[in-house]
UniProtKB/Swiss-Prot annotation:
It comes from Capra hircus. This is Cathelicidin-2. InterPro entries: Cathelicidin-like (IPR001894), Cathelicidin_CS (IPR018216), Cystatin_sf (IPR046350). The modification Proline amide is found at residue 173. Disulfide bonds join 85-96, 107-124. Belongs to the cathelicidin family. Residues 141-176 have a biased composition (Pro residues). Elastase is responsible for its maturation. BAC5 sequence consists almost exclusively of X-P-P-Y repeats. GO terms for molecular function: lipopolysaccharide binding. The lineage of its organism: Eukaryota, Metazoa, Chordata, Craniata, Vertebrata. The modification Pyrrolidone carboxylic acid is found at residue 30.
Length: 176
């Protein structure tokens, strides 16, 4: 009887631990990831925009390292680029291709990771039109060719040519 009561008690504890294990992930899964919060902010920017096409996340700066409450505002910095999808479409921006030579905007501000709180404060400024073309390959710049200095090669020194000395034959004037 005692073992039967112990096994019932153990079964109840197992059931409680199982239920607790199911509830805790649900509570922690409610917080958005940094990227998800930024994607929601981009969606809100697209809804509030008066421009013809949707914008899509191009680059996201790394998340701050501090672990804080999901309800607090986190600083964000990211870039968006114009897509080919019109703003009136129901298609998500992530499924749209980037527009060739589309506008690129740098955005900074704050977002919250709490999914029930869609508050964000984002300001975007146009950077430039980005053209995706391969870089021009140019040959490397080389300095002009200057060979090492070498003095001119001269023939070995030879004295001027003089015929060999031949004593004169005959009487010499001034000698006796």
């Amino acid at each position: 009887m005692e073992t039967q009561g112990a096994s019932l008690s153990l079964g109840r504890w197992s059931l409680w631990l199982l239920l607790l294990g199911l509830v805790v992930p649900l509570a922690s899964a409610q917080a958005l990831s940094y990227r998800e919060a930024v994607l929601r902010a981009v969606g809100q920017l697209n809804e509030r925009s008066s421009e013809a096409n949707l914008y899509r996340l191009l680059e996201l700066d790394p998340a701050p390292n501090d672990e804080v409450d999901p309800g607090t505002r986190k600083p964000v910095s990211f870039t968006v680029k114009e897509t080919v999808c019109p703003r009136t479409t129901q298609q998500p921006p992530e499924e749209c291709d980037f527009k060739e030579n589309g506008l690129v905007k740098q955005c900074v501000g704050t977002v919250t990771l709490d999914p029930s709180n869609d508050q964000f404060d984002i300001n975007c400024n146009e950077l430039q039109s980005v053209r995706f073309r391969p870089p021009i390959r140019r040959p490397p710049i080389r300095p002009p060719f200057n060979p090492p200095f070498r003095p001119p090669v001269r023939p070995p020194f030879r004295p001027p040519f003089r015929p060999p000395f031949r004593p004169p034959i005959g009487p010499f004037p001034g000698r006796r």
